[in-house]
Amino acid sequence: MDSDDLQVFQNELICCICVNYFIDPVTIDCGHSFCRPCLCLCSEEGRAPMRCPSCRKTSEKPNFNTNLVLKKLSSLARQTRPQNINSSDNICVLHEETKELFCEADKRLLCGPCSESPEHMAHSHSPIGWAAEECREKLIKEMDYLWEINQETRNNLNQETSTFHSLKDYVSVRKRIITIQYQKMPIFLDEEEQRHLQALEREAEELFQQLQDSQVRMTQHLERMKDMYRELWETCHMPDVVLLQDVRNVSARTDLAQMQKPQPVNPELTSWCITGVLDMLNNFRVDSALSTEMIPCYISLSEDVRYVIFGDDHLSAPTDPQGVDSFAVWGAQAFTSGKHYWEVDVTLSSNWILGVCRDSRTADANFVIDSDERFFLISSKRSNHYSLSTNSPPLIQYVQRPLGRVGVFLDYDNGSVSFFDVSKGSLIYGFPPSSFSSPLRPFFCFGCT
């Protein structure tokens, strides 16, 4: 191959973004290839849809596999390029020979005689070009790890922003349902109601401040990590000799990034005891509200419900039936009028759905959340995160998840369904009044989300 052909061949191994030999090359949908780090840095923080820096075509696929052929050829091209290793800084003072070897143990450049000395002869030594490529591989892994932290932090920041706005809406809703519940009480509790509303306002303001502070910390952390990522990217493109002398503190930096990663706020409001509420509810108590017959139930969550429960991860959240892990218990009777109260023990399950729904027990086993005239409180656990929510419309409940018995109160004539934490004597949530048009039956499903 003559020099012109060689130059053409080498040009095919150069990334058009950094104008260096490829580092961890990927080939995107349009056929153009780039260093993965270059693509991450210039593709709007790595979020899809991404546009090709060369032809501007949209690429739907967010992640690409490494082009192993390009990677190998680029590595060989780097190792065969001229190395400026004869500078005075790279001449051994003791033996006056060029340092052409790298000591893996001491992370130092050595000349031949030094590598055979008693101090180094038991260590592993590599040619500088080969050692530099090994070092770049380690740097790429560190960069991948750093980018994962970056993406996780960015997702947390987006979720934190969403939580801030949804919490504001929730606090407004909670004020209304607290006021409505006190209006239903047979005794005047004006002072207690005002105390609860004022306490709710104080707690909410504290949580809003925590969320705002968290957003600032995450934004600052993203900037630091982007700078660190760019620094590692620049280190990868250093000449071999400079690279090997500069790489000692890489792992310490990425470990520090993980340790300093801000954790998202998990906002939780106090649900205060309402004096006499359980005594009032027990006047309408229904014994054996639920049947003793358990039926395998195939639960599907509508997309808006999954989004509320799982946030930005809702597309990967479960939608399909969970098979025999899910069982439903229907009410022993359907209600068409009056007030009715019953309790269900949820102590033994983290995943459950509780409430009332249109009388459709004879329908097939497929059950979709959310549909008309289905009023549910939903508890779910994914990884180590617990979520409490309601449907119709989907709404996260920013109160502590009940761990014992949950009370359900149906006021059919006034079109309302409410949930209570029995151990606290507190209101969890009350659906806004509506008009029921069909019989409603108690429903409980566990192990279903």
From Swiss-Prot:
GO terms for molecular function: ubiquitin protein ligase activity; zinc ion binding. Residues 268-449 form the B30.2/SPRY domain. GO terms for biological process: innate immune response; regulation of gene expression. This is Tripartite motif-containing protein 64B. Pfam families: SPRY (PF00622), zf-B_box (PF00643), zf-C3HC4 (PF00097). Residues 189-225 form a coiled coil. It comes from the Eukaryota. PANTHER family: E3 UBIQUITIN-PROTEIN LIGASE TRIM. The gene is TRIM64B.
